[in-house]
Structures are given as C-alpha cells and as structure tokens.
A protein has these predicted regions:
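N-terminal FAD cofactor-binding segment of flavoenzymes
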Residues: 50-91
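N-terminal Rossmann-like FAD-binding beta1-loop-alpha1 element of flavoenzymes
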Residues: 9-36
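C-terminal helical "tail/cap" subdomain of flavin- and related membrane-associated enzymes
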Residues: 318-405
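FAD/FMN-dependent oxidoreductases across multiple families
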Residues: 239-331
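Conserved FAD-binding catalytic core of PHBH/FMO-like flavoproteins
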Residues: 66, 149-270, 275
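Conserved N-terminal helical subregion
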Residues: 7-8, 78-178, 186-191
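Conserved Rossmann-like nucleotide-cofactor binding loop
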Residues: 19, 42, 172
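Glycine-rich FAD pyrophosphate-binding loop
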Residues: 28-51
Length: 405
C-alpha cells in the first residue's frame, strides 16, 4: 500500500471503516488503482489492550466475507467470541424464544468481534497490496460528476479524479450530501448505552436480549468471560444511566436484565451512540455508489448494521470486478444499478422489520402486548419458521454475493 501524489484512480473509497476497508481488500491485487480516504488515521490495535467499546455481532455470512478477504485468520487468532445460542424474552409477559445454531447446522449463530480488530485485520491485508493508496487524513469538500470521471476536491486543496466514487463514510455521510442523494430518515430519540461488564454467572457462549417498554437490553458474550451491554433508552433516561457511578450502573443492568447472569459485579466506563433509521433514496448515480451506513442505518436491536454493510460491500465488489472483467465502464449507471437491485430492496425489508419490532416491543397497548407474547411463543414452537428467521438473520438465505457464500 502506498501514499503517493497520484491524483487519478479507478475507484476512490471515502470512509475507511470496516465496510470501506473491506471493499478496498476485495479489490486488492487487481489492475484497478484504488484510493481510500478518511478524516482520521486508521485506529491502532494492540493485542491485550482493553477491548474496544464498539463490538459487532458478525453473522456467519460476514465471517465468510472476512475469511474470503484473508482477514478472518488474524481475527480468529486474536480475539473472537462465537456464540451458539441466543435467548430473547419480553419483560411484560411470558413470551420468549430460544435460538440454537445446531437447529440450522451451523457452528455458531454469530461472532462478537471488536470494531478496531476487524479494521486492523483488514489493514494488514491492504499493506501488502501495491494497487492501494491511503490518503489519510483527508476530508471531501466538493464533488463534480462528469461524463467520464468524478472530481473530488479535498479541504486541503488537492483534487482527485476517479471513474467511480464510493461513499462509505457513515450515516452522516458528507459524500452522500455533496452528491445530493436524499434520505428518508427519522431519529429514534434514543441512545445505545454500551459497556463491558463482569457477571456472577458465566455467559455460556450465549447472547441474551430482554425487551423492556423503555427499550431492549442485550448482553453479548466476550472472549474474556465478560459481556458487552448494549442498552437502548430514550435520550433523557439514557443520559441518567450513562452517568451513574459504577456500582449504581451495575445494579441497573442487573435489574434490567432480570439477573439472568446473576449480579453485575464490575463495569468499564460507558459510551453512548445516538440511534436513527435512515435509508437513501438511491444507492447509485452515474459514477457514484453508496455502501454501508452511508446508504442505511438501523436500530441495533438485532445487531444487523455491519452485516448489512458487508453484504453491500460484497455485492458492489462483485459488480465492479464483473464489469472490469468484461471491459465495461465500472462507473456506468447501468453497471451500478446491478448493485442497487441486489441490495436496496433487501436492506429496506430489514430496515422495516427492525423498525416494526422496535415499535411493537415498546408499545404497551394490551392487544399488542398479547400479540407479541403469543407471537414469540408460536415462533419458538414452530421449528420451520424459527429456522427461517435464524437463516435470514445469519445471512444464509436469499441470493448472496460470491464473497458471502
């Protein structure tokens, strides 16, 4: 990987998070000249350091993608927590559901991995690629789309030219805004409070989620025996919970999780992330593609955000490589629409499903409370339907891009 003064590229990827870096990896060692841009330097990773506050529940499909990119071996050898079961229940009734990876013949339902470690493993792959140029830090200031290329102007005065501009710079994507692609979005007025805690009882490689009227709380197993708490609350109570002292926070998590792992005995400092629903009106324009959170954002109650983004990346990489192999213009709108057809409807279905679940479980109208409890019990007992839900959440159903198979 180089840091050159070149200003002309085949693909410029704005945003060097998990999805953007993964796309660069998918295009490494090809005859395409790739640039990655980010406002920050890549995050530093040190084995044995305190775990990153941001951990992801990677689906088996995401694991396969990272394996195909050559990053999984580093992740597996460093720090990963597979979970084989998941238990979900409603705080205001007797509805509950139990998912087990054995029911669908998979070794795990998913894998809890630090955001920082995933990026580190991907960057190790990029370091050996001679067709990748890293331009960090760099901030886009203007975009001009021409017939044959995009000109991307940076705040430091540089100008980059590319056949294809990919926006992977998050839900507040500056690139998407500069291009002028609209979104349908709504703030939930909630925050996800995140911390790593120690509990009296072992997590048994199980993820736990309890739906409270105020928002879901999830306990995700970590490799070192702790669990990662992801607790979604309205803004005001979230701030109260976040600022509790350690003892009071541990007691609050114990109560909210119904003591499923016994008392919470220790905690890290807390972090908070604002929650919203967002979907771009279009994923592509001539010479432009959106991917990951730049195209969509979802409620974290099912941990699907990064998994959706990695599937986006895999589909876009497939479209780019297929076009290049056929000597077609990788920035042509007819080429890029293949990517939009592959991902937009699928992502919309997931966004609406998660939004519906969020609203259903936060509504205390008696008929809806009865409906969700009856529904949970029914799905738990009807194995074919439960298996279908599991395979969908695990990224194992539908038409998958080659990297995810």
């Amino acid at each position: 990987m180089g840091r050159t003064a070149d200003s002309s590229f085949d693909v410029v990827i704005v945003g060097a998070g998990v999805v953007g870096t993964a796309l660069a990896c998918a295009l490494r060692n090809t005859d395409l000249h790739i640039a990655t841009l980010d406002a920050r330097e890549p995050p530093r990773f040190a084995a044995g350091a305190e775990l990153d506050m941001r951990v992801f529940a990677l689906s088996p499909a995401s694991q396969r993608i990272l394996d195909a990119l050559g990053a999984w071996e580093t992740i597996r050898a460093t720090c990963v927590a597979p979970y084989s079961e998941m238990r979900v229940w409603d705080a205001t009734g007797n509805g509950r559901i139990h998912f087990d990876c054995a029911d669908v013949g998979e070794p795990a339902l998913g894998y809890i991995v630090e955001n920082r470690l995933i990026q580190h493993a991907l960057w190790l792959r990029l370091k050996t690629a001679d067709n990748i140029t890293a331009i960090h830090p760099a901030t886009p200031e203007a975009v001009k789309i021409g017939a044959d290329q995009v000109t991307l102007s940076l705040q430091d005065g540089r100008h980059l030219h590319t056949r294809l501009l990919v926006a992977g710079d998050g839900a507040d994507s500056a690139t998407r805004k500069l291009v002028g692609i609209d979104t349908l979005s709504a703030a939930y007025g909630q925050q996800a409070i995140v911390a790593h805690v120690r509990t009296e009882k072992p997590h048994r490689d199980t993820a736990w989620q309890r739906f409270l009227p105020t928002g879901p709380i999830a306990l995700l197993p970590l490799q070192d025996g702790r669990v990662s708490v992801v607790w979604s609350l309205d803004d005001a109570p979230a701030e109260e919970i976040r600022t509790l002292d350690d003892s009071a926070f541990c007691a609050a998590v114990t109560q909210a999780s119904e003591g499923v792992l016994g008392n919470v005995t220790a905690t890290t400092p807390r972090a908070a992330f604002s929650l919203q629903r967002l979907h771009a009106s279009e994923y592509v324009r001539s010479r432009v593609a959106l991917t990951g959170d730049a195209a969509h954002a979802v409620h974290p109650l099912a941990g699907q955000g990064v998994n959706m983004g990695l599937l986006d990346m895999a589909a876009l990489a497939d479209v780019i490589l297929a076009a290049q192999a056929r000597q077609r213009d990788i920035g042509d709108l007819s080429v890029l629409r293949r990517y939009q057809r592959a991902r937009k409807a699928d992502n919309l279905a997931m966004i609406m499903a998660l939004d519906g679940l969020k609203r259903l479980f936060s509504n205390e109208i008696a008929p809806l409370r009865l409906l969700r409890n009856v529904g949970l019990r029914a799905v738990d007992r009807f194995t074919p339907l439960k298996s279908a839900f599991m395979r969908r959440a695990m990224g194992l159903s539908g038409e998958l891009p080659p990297l995810a198979r």
